[in-house]
Amino acid sequence: MHTTITRPARTLALFCALLLAGNVLSTGTARAKSTKGHDHAHNHAHGAKSDVYNGYFKDDQVKPRTLEDWEGEWQSVYPYLVDGTLDPVMADKAKHGDKSAGEYRAYYDAGYKTDVDRIVIAGASVTFFRGQRSAKANYVTDGYEILTYAKGNRGVRFIFRKTDGDDAAPQFIQFSDHNIAPEIADHYHLYWGTDRAALLKEVTNWPTYYPSDLTGKQIVKEMLAH
């Protein structure tokens, strides 16, 4: 059976086809713009986080933090530097930096050096382990300080003061983990002692801690990722 399409019908069919094509093109363009906008937003957010990590931020970006951000069991990375586990990290720094692997190793030896090999943080309590010996105390927030370093970038120390506990536990502890607002830490540098102001001047020794459930090789992978 042969069907004849009249001129008005042909005109209507052509109009519908053009309308459908326009809608498809418009949707495709909108999706392209949306994807491009998402990529731009993602890159901008990543860039902003990278700036903060490298020490470039505005004062009003800094927000108070609680011990909850560092809760958990942590291990010192110093033994891994001593036994050579971190040698690939030093080699990578030498490849991209201005010192030899040996020079970087000496720099990090001074920075990581500590006899506190493990720290456990739970609620307000912090326990410091030196081998089989431990010292435990409760801490409350004592604000934060923004520091400017020699090369022009900055860092934030989040400070906590002891309220009670063992005499061997430090009076003040200061966290630095490249974050400047509430965020769960994946590692941190810790400063401790009896003099709040004096600790702020300490920039050569910064014992560094990673989660206790990570192996040395996993810590190397984490460090190389940064």
Predicted regions and their residues:
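Polyanion-binding surfaces on beta-sheet-dominated domains and ring/shell assemblies
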Residues: 10
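Amphipathic/hydrophobic helical signal segments and adjacent flexible N-terminal regions
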Residues: 2-6, 15-16, 22-100, 176, ...
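Contiguous, well-ordered beta-strand patches that form the walls/edges
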Residues: 105-173
